[in-house]
Structures are given as C-alpha cells and as structure tokens.
Amino acid sequence: KLPLPGRTLLDVGCGGGFLAEEFARDGFAVTGIDPATRSLEAARKHAADNNLDIDYREGKGEALPFPDASFDVVACCDVLEHVDDLSLVIREVARTLKPGGVFFYDTVNRTWFSKLAVIKLSQEWNFTRWCKPNSHVWEKFIKPAELLAFLNRNGLTNQELRGISSRKNPLALLASLRAVKKGKLNHRAIGPSFDLCETEDLRVSYMGYAIKSPRV
C-alpha cells in the first residue's frame, strides 16, 4: 500500500529466491544477490521453471556490485542478523538506493525471549530443533535502537516498526516446530504453519521500512 518511487528492486540475501519471486510477480524488476552459489543455482532454476525474469548475482551485502542510486527499493529480509558487518551493509543499502527510495527489512531482536524462541527452541533443544546448529547467533541479533541508529547515520529515516509474532498458542506452536523437525513441513510451508502476524510486540522479530532522504 506504500507509494513507491519506481519498480526496480534489490533483494539483499535473496537465498533461494522465495521473496524475489513474490516481488517479481508483483511487477518489480528484481535483482537478487547472495553469497551462496548453491542457493543462487536453485533460485535461477526455480525462476526459470516459473517463467520469472529475475537477475541473480553472487555477492555480499557489505560490497554491493552496483552503482550509486541504482534501485527504487531495497529489501533485506531475515538477513541483517547474519551479516558480518551490519554498519557496512546499511551503508551499501543507502548508497545503492535512489533518493526517496525505500528500504524494507525484518530481523531478530536481541532479547531473552528471542534467545528462547530462535536459539533454544529452533536450534538447540532436540525435541523441537529444526535449524542447523549456529544458523543464528544470539549475539548478532539487533536491538531496534541499534538498527535505527545505523539507518539515521546513513540518511535513512525510519517510518514504521512492527513486531512479528504467531497467532498460535504455545502448545500449537510447539506442534508446528515438531512437524518441521520431523520433515512433515518444508521451508516454504514454515511461515504459514506458524501463522505469523503483525503485532506491537517486538521481543522476537520485527520489521519496518525507511526512506532515503530526497536530498542525499
């Protein structure tokens, strides 16, 4: 619903292309970048199988191989908590955005609640774990105030901040985690099975968007 300045979009950390394909279906001219060769190979094949024209490149968010002011929109979803240098990634996002461009993001907060949900339940406890060990590192999670400071420092003004949570009660959520662990749900079905929704609660994950100053 947000009015966008144009239809060129960069998906940073695109992985297998799940979101890149949705953006392409919405009419964006999409470029995806990721450091993982195998993920990009899978993304290219899946896009071709679905007749989607997406430009996939190999690279890292810390050194985006694009000229200044290349994109109307940059998206970085489930990625910021994994990067080696967050400040450099945000600087590169701001550099490649056109003035007035929009940066969409979601990431994980660094709280005791996120440690329970993302580290303990998803990675460490045998009964529920479905992620590989060290897929997430709690110390790399990002408090909202920290991210907003990086955005402001690079001429990006945050417009909205919303939490991401599950509508399910704790027992139903544990059942979903068990289904993922036992292989009854694939990665594309994880989100729907968790029944995620927007919330005011930022304790685990949060999302938002920022706009690059038209004068930058």
Task: Please tell me what each predicted stretch does.
Residues 62-73:
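A short acidic, Gly/Pro-enriched loop at the edge of an enzyme's catalytic core
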Residues 10, 16-63:
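Class I SAM-dependent methyltransferase SAM/SAH-binding core
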Residues 102-127:
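Conserved class I S-adenosyl-L-methionine
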Residues 73-84:
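A short SAM/SAH-binding and catalytic strip from SAM-dependent methyltransferases
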Residues 50, 149, 153, 158-216:
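A C-terminal cap/extension of S-adenosyl-L-methionine-dependent methyltransferases
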Residues 1-7:
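Conserved alpha-helix/loop element of class I SAM-dependent methyltransferases that forms part
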Residues 87-99:
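A short glycine-rich, Lys/Arg-flanked "PGG" loop and its adjoining helix->strand segment in the class I
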